[in-house]
Amino acid sequence: MDVGGALDLYGCSVNVYNAILIFIWVLFLWETYINLRQLKVAKRVTESPEEIKCLMNDVDFDKSRRYAIDKMNFDIVSGFYNILSLSAVLYFQLIAWAWHKSQEHMLFVCSYAPRSFGTTEGSEILFSLLFTVYVALFQFFESLPWSYYRHFVIEERYGFNKQTIGFFIKDRLKSLAVGLVIGLPIISMLVWIIKAGGHYFYIYAYGFTFVVSFIIMFIYPEFIAPIFDRYEHFPDCELRKKIEELAASIEFPLKKLYVVEGSKRSSHSNAYFYGFGKNKRIVLFDTLIKGFKMPGVEADSSANADESSDETQNRGCGDDEEILATLAHELGHWKLKHMTFNLIIAQINIFFMFFAFGQLINVDQLFVDFGFPPSTAPILIRLIVVFQFIFMPYSSVLEFLMTMLSRKFEFQADAFAVSLKSGEKLKSALLVLTKDNLSFPVYDWLYSMCNHSHPPIIERLAAIDAKMGKEK
């Protein structure tokens, strides 16, 4: 196979294809190495650490250990498949093949359409849209068996999966449809902006993505998330009153409080907030609250009887103060402006990537190695090659740094909850969630450093104790 020539970079001859292929395999081997380190820890440690024995006995610990081993083995095998698949895409120049097929099929369709429909000026956008659909369909079918195994074998084995096969397929199809409905217009506009924007197109492209990102941040929780899960206003009760008092005590502008029926798909629990300015919402998963029933569930309880179990009903925090402590942690992210900081970093990163793309867009040799002769690579392909492959080392380093920053933010949010006198309840809530989610509490330091955006439970408990000691 012809993989193109070499790129002259500051007097050095660099084969782009070989460099990318070497990097993705080095990255895969590194990730496999640290996964094997963690797998070794999970197999070696067979007794619950003293710090969490008060809640997780050896039986529960062994179950969490087996769960961790199963997930780790799955990640290693699926990772090996993914690297083989990506290598095949590069080696056989399948990106170019898919693009040419998109051209052929779109030209065939246009031959039966009005003459103006397939004009040369707009044809690249049409080709880009069909190419995107083909890639989305390929990824949909390629990931389907892996997702099925994760949910219906691993998650099912440990009592987490609550989806039926019908729900699973429908959920995946909805994700595909929503992704295309949102993604295709964005791709159309982005290709048009880059083609028409001249030398400073990267400024206009960044401005467009900036606006789109804020629009999506607004419409996703209000209009898109309810497509996948049922959201209800949190019922009037003592817990609701306490949550509103907590929000008011730190001047959090809470406008609405929701509960989401996460139990329909999984027993895992969560809580989060969203919104702009003085229009914030808090969302609690029904699985976070022990014994919680979604409004109206009694009316169809017989139909859903098989979807719930005593084990599921016994999961979650049974103490209101534990739930409040969990929310105090989440609201700490808002009070300490972590979300704003992350948003600023994201915008700087997007602008930098578009600026760098502006310097590389006309370096034809980058795209020859992907099967496109000089000056023939379309805009969308140039975006994919540069953003996904050329920037891969940069993106990997940035991802690691953001993981480290996230860990720091988690410690700070825990400390904020302690400052609200919720330290002990936060500890007990973390222990409950660790047990309920079968989170294996012992980690290899290198694996944890590279993979955990949230610190391990033992580190968090120690930090909370240290903070409470200083507060006394």
Swiss-Prot record:
Lumenal topological domain residue ranges: 1-8, 97-124, 197-207, 362-382
Domain of life: Eukaryota
Catalytic function, reaction form: Hydrolyzes the peptide bond -P2-(S-farnesyl or geranylgeranyl)C-P1'-P2'-P3'-COOH where P1' and P2' are amino acids with aliphatic side chains and P3' is any C-terminal residue
This enzyme's EC code(s): 3.4.24.84
Membrane-spanning residues: 9-29, 76-96, 125-145, 176-196, 208-228, 341-361, 383-403
Role noted for this protein: Zinc-dependent metalloproteinase. Proteolytically removes the C-terminal three residues of farnesylated proteins.
Name of this protein: CAAX prenyl protease 1 homolog
Taxonomic classification: Eukaryota, Metazoa, Spiralia, Lophotrochozoa, Platyhelminthes
Gene: TsSte24p
